[in-house]
Amino acid sequence: SKYGIDINYITPLLPVQILWINLVTDSLPALALAVDPAERDIMKRKPAKKQKGIFTKGMTWRIVYQGLMIGFITLAAFIIGIATPDEKLPDMIEIEGKYYNVQEVDNVEQKIADGAKLLDKQQVKVEIGQAMAFIVLALSELVHVFNIRNNKKSIFKTGIGGNNWLFGAIAIAAALVFVILLIPELRHVFSIPVLPKSNIIETVSLVLAPIVIVEIFKLFKINTAKDE
């Protein structure tokens, strides 16, 4: 490929990262959304037709485009990660199957003599790409929860309050992600290196991207179908 990496043999996410997304990131907010209070103007709306199912045109449209949105943002994070310039890459070493930043390891020369090996730049790029994809997917889904609470009104009008269970679930899920990022032993389990500053800025931007995109769709009234 352009970056010297054969992308046919790597994946944007590792199995342990996917498991975390399914069990923690998705589960907690989903349960809390079940007790989200009704919208204030709900009694002013026309009653739904009896034959109208759950999967309306509008809901189907949002599932499709918002799912693709999250998917593309995650893939973009991975691609940006593997495109990190060589001069910004951290030095990494593999010890007993786990990857460490060289700065975290004492007696590097002795570790290498004992069988550890320094990662080449291509391997480091893959590690950074997978880390960015995981962080972006985990946190952007939590951010996106606030988008889906109201299909028409801006998040800046509805706010993020009104459901303490939801706010707590998102806070816990986000805090657990940061625990993984801050504790070296957990970072090693999830194969997440310490990201360069430029990658951190790019990651934060992608995490917030769902709010920008959905707000634009709401502004131009294309987040909903005509019959909604």
Q: In which residue ranges do the predicted regions lie?
A:
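C-terminal transmembrane module of polytopic membrane proteins
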Residues: 34, 90-112, 119, 130-131, ...
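Membrane-embedded transport module
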Residues: 1-152
